[in-house]
Amino acid sequence: MHVTQSSSAITPGQTAELYPGDIKSVLLTAEQIQARIAELGEQIGNDYRELSATTGQDLLMITVLKGAVLFVTDLARAIPVPTQFEFMAVSSYGSSTSSSGVVRILKDLDRDIHGRDVLIVEDVVDSGLTLSWLSRNLTSRNPRSLRVCTLLRKPDAVHANVEIAYVGFDIPNDFVVGYGLDYDERYRDLSYIGTLDPRVYQ
């Protein structure tokens, strides 16, 4: 689903009062996000139902902390096949708003993924550099299959050649926060996704 511009200005009744003046506009409402997650869950379930029945193993969803935690939780509930969770924490060197693609593992997986059907679940793919590194790293561990699902994708900023099987929304190259996405550990608690006023991070 393609989003061309911010969908609405902030209104007084929204949770923007948590951060007065910081949110420039709403890009995706909570209702839009949940509706799209339901569609993604159905699509993923259709793709993995037969695999799950054949292998007798649950779909393993791997998420990089912390941004995609809300998304992976809601997505798992929307997928009509059994799922399991694994988490990694990585540090990507670069500025506060962009990645260099140079990655250091802070927390690795707690289990072997050899022979498993793995779905990487991302919050947003912007440069694609960190995702490219993660895909190579996990592929080297010999999973049975490896696919990627992201809630948000910024096509104009993708420099790495990474195939993404499931995309929630294609969005502009705005700096966005909310629904798990942060700036300086703030704004994750918003139920919607909004664009951050540039004065906050400039």
UniProtKB/Swiss-Prot annotation:
It catalyses: IMP + diphosphate = hypoxanthine + 5-phospho-alpha-D-ribose 1-diphosphate; GMP + diphosphate = guanine + 5-phospho-alpha-D-ribose 1-diphosphate. It is an enzyme of class 2 (transferase). One of its GO terms (cellular component) is cytosol. Its cofactor is Mg(2+). GMP binds at residues 154, 175-176, 182. Pathway: Purine metabolism; IMP biosynthesis via salvage pathway; IMP from hypoxanthine: step 1/1; Purine metabolism; GMP biosynthesis via salvage pathway; GMP from guanine: step 1/1. GO terms for molecular function: guanine phosphoribosyltransferase activity; hypoxanthine phosphoribosyltransferase activity; magnesium ion binding; nucleotide binding. The keyword Nucleotide-binding applies. Purine salvage pathway enzyme that catalyzes the transfer of the ribosyl-5-phosphate group from 5-phospho-alpha-D-ribose 1-diphosphate (PRPP) to the N9 position of the 6-oxopurines hypoxanthine and guanine to form the corresponding ribonucleotides IMP (inosine 5'-monophosphate) and GMP (guanosine 5'-monophosphate), with the release of PPi. This is Hypoxanthine-guanine phosphoribosyltransferase. The gene is hpt.
